[in-house]
Regions:
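Enriched for short, Lys/Arg-rich terminal
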Residues: 1-9, 22, 28-31, 65-72, ...
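N-terminal first-folded block
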Residues: 11-47
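A short, surface-exposed loop/turn module that caps and links secondary-structure elements
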Residues: 39-66
């Protein structure tokens, strides 16, 4: 799976990054909503805006938030060792985005 790293703590799958670029070109207001949801996830991963819900089945471990009635932001969090020389934390929590367009498939 191709991964686009926006920051050390935010990773996009290739599919999710294509979704994001689609919104940049076709509906910039959706980009604003996605950005806001990511900011909220950083503070409150399991509660807050977008009606967060844990997913089941093959998506177990992933969460979904509503971008709007049709589209969902699908994400998960995991800890990993800090990047060398970046800061003093022993680990960082990474948000991995799987998709941000359509309902999870």
């Amino acid at each position: 799976m191709a991964v686009h790293r926006d920051r050390d703590d935010l990773w996009w799958s290739g599919h999710a990054w294509e979704d994001y670029l689609y919104w940049q070109s076709n509906d910039p207001k959706k980009v604003d909503v996605i950005t806001r949801l990511i900011e909220i996830i950083r503070r409150e991963p399991w509660t807050g805006l977008g009606k967060p819900e844990p997913l089941k089945g093959s998506y177990k471990g992933w969460w979904s938030r509503r971008i709007d009635q049709e589209h969902r932001l699908v994400y998960r969090l995991f800890d990993m060792p800090r990047p060398p020389g970046k800061d003093t934390r022993e680990s960082i929590t990474v948000i991995q985005i799987s998709q941000c367009r359509f309902h999870y498939d």
